[in-house]
Amino acid sequence: MGTITVKDGTEIFYKDWGKGPAIVFHHGWPLSADDWDSQLLYFLSQGFRVVAYDRRGHGRSSPSFTHNDMDTYADDCAALVKHLGLKGAIHVGHSTGGGEVTRFVAKHGGNGVVSKAVLMNAIPPVMVKSDKNPGGLPIEVFNGMRASFIRSRGQFYRDIASGPFYGFNRPGAKVMQGIVDDWWRQSMMGDAKAQYDCIKTFSETDFTEDLKKIQVPVLVMHGEDDQIVPVADSAPLAAKLLKNATLKIYPGFPHGMFATHPEVINADLLAFFKS
């Protein structure tokens, strides 16, 4: 574990465990590298070097009052990759982290820097509804998120974690309280301004051109019952824009499926990594 200081003075916290082929994990909003701990330990046991970091303004990284945008997120990742000397790494992104991976690979992933990528329940091509994206979520959804965030960030985060994020609001679902508590813990570690800004970033950034630029193999994974990033307007569209994509939809799985169904997701990730 350590930190690096990027060009604007922001400190980025990271974990770097093991030796072997490198996997870099990118977390979702508003979480931290800790969200990947189960995967880090699993793939460490499989002989991989595993890296995960806290996005600026999230987790243990510095508060970030400005530059909470996807280009800067990608540049921060590039600085970390350079610092750690990573070549031919696999980049795995969940949700907003999937957008980060998309922008990073398109912008910085050439010359063998990246060998493969995974977009898991990821936000690309673009979340918000528009004339170009009629199947997207209305801007009122994200305005509502901002209003709830301002009213009580802590309560808003509890409601997300105990409800739609893991599908615990579905009839008959068994709530895993430890997962809910850990989601809230991670989220409240972050900087409120940076997390608030990120709502606009994850909802309005258009990754269409980024997806078209990516040359490496990409596994696009998505839970069919994702209530955060609806599958119909995300994974299938992203896969069509990618040059070398494998699309896998998981019936009944929620947004946070790598936590609720780790055995299934880890096995499919491992098969892709070794293919």
What is each model feature region?
Residues 214, 220-222, 226:
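Short beta-strand/loop motif that positions the catalytic acidic residue
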Residues 102-151:
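Flexible "cap/lid" loop of the alpha/beta hydrolase fold
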Residues 10-63:
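Conserved HGGG/HGGXW glycine-rich cap/lid loop of the alpha/beta-hydrolase fold
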Residues 27-29, 89, 93-95:
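Conserved alpha/beta-hydrolase "nucleophile elbow" surrounding the catalytic nucleophile
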Residues 125-128, 132-137, 147-212:
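Conserved alpha/beta-hydrolase catalytic His-Asp/Glu region
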Residues 244-275:
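Catalytic active-site module of serine/aspartate enzymes centered on a nucleophile-bearing elbow/loop
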Residues 227-233:
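Conserved alpha/beta-hydrolase "acid-adjacent" motif
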Residues 72-89:
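Conserved acidic catalytic loop of the alpha/beta-hydrolase fold
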